[in-house]
Every structure is written in C-alpha cells, then in structure tokens.
C-alpha cells in the first residue's frame, strides 16, 4: 500500500474553511496496448498473460479507484479502449472526461478527467504539435489544457489551469521536444491569463520524456534557457551515445510558427505590449526606452517562459541520494513523468520581463511515494502482476488559498 507523505506543515485552522480548497491530481501514463505490442522487446522480462489488455485494465482501474484523485491526467490512452471501456468506467466513478487523440494514424492520446463534485469545466483546449507546413514539427504528439472552476470556494472568479501532455520520445530530437514544450506553454499562457493580466494557479502534468536536471527540465523549472552550442541529443538528458550531437539551430523553430522566444503567441505578446505602453506615465518614458533596448539586445538563443514552477517530486531519496523512478522496462529505469505547479502566491517571473502575477497560490500538502529501480526489479520491473503499466502513477495533494 503506497502512502501519501507529508511535504509541508499545513495550517489546520478551519475558522474560515471557505478560504481553502484541497484537491488531488494524478499523472499516469497507462501504456497503450498497441504501443506495448509494437515494442514487445521492452517487455521480455514479463510473463505474457500479464501484458494483455484484459489483464491490465482491471489493475489500472483499481489503482485509479484506490488513489481516488480529483483530477486525472492520463497519457497513452488508446482511442478504441477509451470509448468502450476507459471513459464509461471513469464516468461511473464521477469523472467528466476530455480527450485529445494524437494526430496522424497514432492509436492513443491524452485524457484529462475531473470529479464533477469538485470542479466544473470552463474550457477545454487541445494542442496539436504537428504542423504540415513546418518540417521540424512532423510528429503527432499532443497536449490538453483545461480551465477548471473549483466548487465550494469563495472566489467565484478563481480557476485552476491543468495541462496534460506527452512529448516526443526520440532522445536525439531535443529540438522537437523544446518546440513542442514552447507550443504547450503558449497555449497555457493563452488559457490561464485573466482579464486583469494575472495568472490563475497552474498544474502541468505529463510524460515529458526528459530526465531531471536536463536542459529541458531546467527550462521548465527556471523559466530560462540559453541553448547556444547545445547538442540536440543533450536536451532531454536521455541520449548517452555519440549520436544526436548536432547543435541546435538558431532559432530552433521558424517565425512562421507564431510563437516568440518567451513561449507566447506573438499576437498575444504584441497586444500585451500595446496595453503596457498605454499605462505608462510621462516620467517613465526614459526608463521604458532603456528596457526596450535591453529586450532588443536579448540573445537569439535565449528562451524564456512566464511561470515560476515547482516540481512535486525531488527526484532523489533524501537519505541515500538514490534516484526515484517513474518508468521501468527492459531498456531503461528513470524519471520522465512530472507534476509541476505554481507554488508562490502573487509571485512575478524573475527574468522573463513579462511581469505576470498569480492570483492565489498552490500549497503542496503531500505526494504519493515513488520507488527506486532496485525496488522495481525486486518485483520483476514494470509491468508486473499488480502494476500494469511501464510507468508509475504520480499523485499530489494541493491546497488553493486566498
């Protein structure tokens, strides 16, 4: 039985309970059956019968029932099984489900589901990373960005933005991964920003096919990346062979994509700049001119985004320093799955220049414990008799406060 471990000291004062809203979020790559069968060499360590969908689905559903998250961010959800089994089963548990299938002829996609007793849906925004007119973006990965309204909360205007994605696997194509991430961040900015220019709280989940402290991971956490001289095979930290040593081009993605170096839709960025200019007073003109010069001198290899994100997991066990693992099969045992969140209340971005403010903040109350590679191989790796994906579920409990 896995446990929720306490992450921080929580104020238990319930004098004003309407000022708090507690909820849980799960991120889980459930392993598409077609992808399992197409990559059977990864599961040679498994007994054949435990790899069938008829065996795996009851285990996956039992895990979801046991953890009972308020929001589910699922990846590798196979479309034919989603319609006939997964969606009906989750609806019977009180979830509303949104689904985005991968483009092309890919069999699976991302599903984000939420308890209707805890949230109502304000908007559902699918993101397709394929662009037929941009050779770089020839892969069929997708994302899904939901805006959810908490029930039983005093601020009727407060919403939570939940993003779910599964980035490209190929370890040697960090250029594609970074561009897919920029596209997701641009859509999150578009969905999460309010009329007053503030952001609502954010939770970003998924399989990012990148290891902790890789350049892609650090970009998400720190909000900035200078990619000058960076090899495409080093972006995600997965590639250990000499292959993938080609250096990232400058710029990574073409102007025709319509996304700036700040990972914002360019039209949205132009509008924001116009509104900012109208608000400036006469005595700040000189200062504004200086700031414009600084922006103009920004290196073309500088990427930024407008969020301050924390990771629910620390990725290493504090006592031993042994790495936590979120996926394990015959070829690999690493962390590639994450839950990121906006932890700081009314915090401004440090260096992007966006000047965004968050309304409210998320406090991490607890998380589901992960295990080490050694722990997993003690039960014959993944999938096994009780864990029926090659990934482990992540789970976090948050508190939304004024």
Name the predicted role of every residue range.
Residues 1-92, 99-109, 182-183, 233-234, ...:
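N-terminal, active-site-proximal structural segment of metallo-dependent hydrolase catalytic domains
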Residues 38-42, 102, 124-127, 161, ...:
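Short coil/turn segments at secondary-structure boundaries
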Residues 31, 78, 168, 208-211:
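Catalytic metal-binding/acid-base residues of hydrolase active sites
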Residues 143-150, 154-163, 177-205, 210:
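His/acidic metal-ligating clusters that form di-metal
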Residues 1-12, 182, 189-203, 208-402:
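Metal-dependent phosphoester-hydrolase catalytic domains
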Residues 1-22, 71-169, 173, 244-246, ...:
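Structured beta-strand-rich core segments of catalytic domains in phosphoester-bond hydrolases
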Residues 35-36, 65, 69-72, 82, ...:
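Short amphipathic alpha-helices and their capping/turn residues within compact interaction modules
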């Amino acid at each position: 039985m896995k446990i929720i471990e306490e992450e921080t000291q929580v104020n238990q004062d319930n004098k004003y309970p309407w000022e708090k809203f507690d909820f849980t979020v799960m991120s889980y790559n459930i392993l598409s059956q077609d992808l399992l069968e197409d990559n059977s060499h990864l599961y040679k360590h498994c007994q054949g019968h435990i790899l069938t969908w008829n065996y795996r689905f009851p285990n996956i559903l039992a895990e979801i029932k046991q953890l009972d998250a308020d929001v589910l961010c699922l990846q590798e959800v196979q479309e034919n099984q989603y319609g006939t089994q997964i969606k009906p089963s989750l609806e019977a548990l009180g979830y509303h489900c949104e689904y985005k299938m991968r483009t092309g002829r890919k069999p699976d996609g991302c599903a984000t589901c939420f308890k209707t007793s805890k949230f109502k849906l304000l908007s559902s925004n699918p993101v397709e990373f394929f662009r037929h007119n941009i050779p770089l973006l020839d892969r069929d990965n997708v994302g899904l960005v939901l805006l959810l309204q908490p029930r039983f909360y005093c601020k009727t205007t407060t919403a939570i933005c939940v993003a779910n994605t599964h980035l490209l696997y190929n370890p040697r194509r960090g250029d594609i991964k970074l561009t897919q991430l920029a596209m997701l961040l641009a859509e999150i900015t578009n969905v999460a920003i309010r009329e007053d220019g503030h952001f609502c709280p954010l939770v970003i989940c998924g399989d990012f096919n990148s290891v902790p402290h890789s350049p892609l991971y650090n970009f998400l956490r720190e909000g900035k990346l200078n990619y000058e001289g960076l090899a495409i095979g080093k972006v995600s930290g997965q590639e250990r062979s000499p292959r993938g040593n080609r250096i990232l081009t400058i710029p990574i993605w073409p102007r025709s994509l319509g996304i700036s170096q700040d990972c914002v839709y360019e039209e949205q960025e132009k509008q924001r700049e116009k509104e900012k200019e109208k608000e400036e007073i006469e005595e700040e003109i000189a200062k504004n001119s200086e700031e414009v010069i600084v922006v103009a001198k920004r290196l073309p290899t500088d990427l930024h985004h407008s969020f301050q994100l924390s990771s629910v997991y620390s990725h290493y066990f504090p006592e031993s320093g042994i790495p936590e693992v979120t996926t394990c099969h015959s070829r690999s045992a690493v962390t590639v799955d994450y839950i990121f969140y906006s932890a700081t209340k009314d915090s401004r971005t440090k260096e992007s220049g966006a000047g965004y403010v968050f309304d409210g903040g998320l406090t991490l109350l607890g998380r589901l414990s992960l295990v080490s590679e050694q722990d997993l191989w003690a039960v014959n790796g993944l999938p096994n008799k009780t864990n029926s994906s090659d990934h482990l579920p992540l789970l976090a409990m948050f508190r939304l406060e004024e």
